[in-house]
Amino acid sequence: MNKYFENVSKIKYEGPKSNNPYSFKFYNPEEVIDGKTMEEHLRFSIAYWHTFTADGTDQFGKATMQRPWNHYTDPMDIAKARVEAAFEFFDKINAPYFCFHDRDIAPEGDTLRETNKNLDTIVAMIKDYLKTSKTKVLWGTANLFSNPRFVHGASTSCNADVFAYSAAQVKKALEITKELGGENYVFWGGREGYETLLNTDMEFELDNFARFLHMAVDYAKEIGFEGQFLIEPKPKEPTKHQYDFDVANVLAFLRKYDLDKYFKVNIEANHATLAFHDFQHELRYARINGVLGSIDANTGDMLLGWDTDQFPTDIRMTTLAMYEVIKMGGFDKGGLNFDAKVRRASFEPEDLFLGHIAGMDAFAKGFKVAYKLVKDRVFDKFIEERYASYKDGIGADIVSGKADFRSLEKYALERSQIVNKSGRQELLESILNQYLFAE
């Protein structure tokens, strides 16, 4: 295939000294580390929406992107051309996976029946390409936020007709995700939240959200979909306050409604930023609670208060992210999906490759540094020593449950003074830099 990206050949690993912009400097998919290839460890995925449907439109200006597959006038012809362009891109960049929203791959019709017919046509085309492609589907999802019908939300809408439509749309999205061999299914509630509590029954909306998710679980069982269900936290945008604010918020919701046995989380770096968390914080909280399912790999601008979805190029960030993934034991069904878009001024088709190469190299380098940090137990050894007071004596009594307030008071009264030790943050940050910049 060489129709839409004629100026780009297959992207290959050439090493860190290469001056070829269309090559991997750190991502060698065939390199074996700890018994698995880099490709198997990282499980990279291309986001269909940012890569093939985004046109550069923003609130202040029109489309800028040069996308040769968009020259048709019929929306279905554009959708078919996008499939051709997508698989040419997947092949040239050697992508293991891609992700999609239902409305990314096929246009809406005038009715739900017509929309589903459009989906069936494009899904059949994608299935044909999948037969000869190494690329697979990491996850599918439904766009329950763009159409004006979702102005008050989808499953949390005050309008029961919208709830019903949303259910029908997710039903179809689950079916096509299963049909395409998707390994996960994602729920992101962009409109599941509120602008003001003056007109909102929060308790009822959360109850309905849970009812909706239970229906999805039941239908997945009915059709035999064995993929992992994921919720993607985000605190705001487009809604002022979204119900899936952050990992802790999502986990509390899942536990309250007896959904935690079915769901994990898909964590996006830029969404962590919007929740005023470090990316690693969200990953760590999910990991220690056993719900880290997948990652949307991007980054945000710390000086801006909205979701910029930039390609991740900060090796420190990717290292600390992959540190959590490695400590988890690696991905199961999840992966690293580049929910990232080239900048509005990076409008040429070739920029799509350059953006993904930058992100893939950044995570590959981060993975290798993180693997060495874990193997050398750099932080583990320090942390074990820092909490050593709980290994014996009164600390061991606290951990085992032997201690109570009376015994702890007696112990405290008998101590003349408390001696703390330094946290050595600066030392650890310096050691991290040693690993980051080691040759």
From Swiss-Prot:
Keywords: Carbohydrate metabolism, Cobalt, Cytoplasm, Isomerase, Metal-binding, Xylose metabolism
Record-listed E.C. numbers: 5.3.1.5
This protein's record includes keyword Cell membrane: no
Signal peptide coordinates: none
UniProt-listed Pfam families: AP_endonuc_2
Top-rank lineage group of the source organism: Bacteria
Subcellular location: Cytoplasm
Protein name: Xylose isomerase
Lineage, highest ranks first: Bacteria, Bacillati, Bacillota, Clostridia, Thermoanaerobacterales
